[in-house]
Amino acid sequence: MVHLTICLPTRNRQAYCIKTIAALAEAEGPDFEVVVADNSDDPAPLADYLANQLADPRFRLIPPGDSVLPMVANWERALEHARGRWIAVIGDDDYIDPRLVAIIRRYEVLYRDVDAISWECMSYNWPDNRPVPTLANIPVGQGTGPNSTEALANQLFRWSERKRRPSVGVGIYHGAIKRSLMERIKEAYGGRYFEHPNPDWESSCKVIMQARLIIHSQRPFSVLGACAASNSAATLSPKVMKQRIETFEKETTGPISLYRPEFPFSLKTGGASICLSIAVTTSWFCQTYGVSLDGFGVNFAHAAMDECVFSATQDEYEAKVACFQSGFDQWDDGRWAGHFKPAPFKPPRTINQISGVGDDRLNVREADIGAATPAEFYRFGEHAIAPMDSLINGTQVFAL
């Protein structure tokens, strides 16, 4: 049996996807596979590349259907085709180290009940997605061990950290989930692996609720890439954010809407943010499945204020404040509106100009390193972190 399936859902980003596939194919060994779920308008580029240029039996293509699928449906069919004992999902402009298979095997020996593995991720902007100076970052921590599901639940469901994004890296997106856990999730939640239009954060919710043992590594095994065509690129431009949301809404069908009266914040306004998108997903899950939201109202008000701090211009700041204020005024009859008190706008002194180590991450100016893809950046970043072979063999590194 294949030990790890890497699912690669993609839509209309064939050039990036082909580079990602080529990088994964460089890894040796028959114990992993890659399932490419193509949801593109033109099926030819990926079909031709996989059949005639790559011709690697470890890579399987699911061609586009008769009509465009919502993202959640494309993810669903990718998992339905997975054969691996463990499953991971990455984006078509990301990278994951296939040697993760050996790490999984080691964790299965060290932690008998493990059914979910998470790790810190490197982040990287493709060369075409740098409208302003950008920093890539490399987590430099070395610890590994069990994660408390109670603590993770507080961070994700109640937003206990009061930051613009919960620091929860658990889930099938840039994580590895045992097949048995995914089947348990499917049985518990309506006979599907995924329901919500934001399947990555939905997966985090469900894994935290259903996992028996989550092991977290501070050492990264993957790269979150952001190309110019990605949803992640929207974080660098409010205009792009609005365009991405409009396209997403247009192509999303199904019973679950991104707008809900129970949490009346709109993602269609100019001030929408990743922060709000995550909150829409986590609040939906908690309200749908009866998970406690005690403390969420006040905590999210602080998280929203933190999001407003990350504004490059006065216009961006005002749009975010207006978006959040409108939602807080309507939510629970304005119960939490008094807690949303954003500080006045302060323009950033510099934008991604300073490299160095902070918060256990090495920040590097991307214009200076020459890496053209996430895979190349991963190989660059490995010079600053524990060697993979040492982790696999359990040998000590960086000893005093």
Where in the sequence are the language-model features?
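Nucleotide-sugar donor-binding/catalytic module of glycosyltransferases
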Residues: 1-242
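C-terminal subregions of glycosyltransferases and related glycan-biosynthesis enzymes
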Residues: 120, 222-400
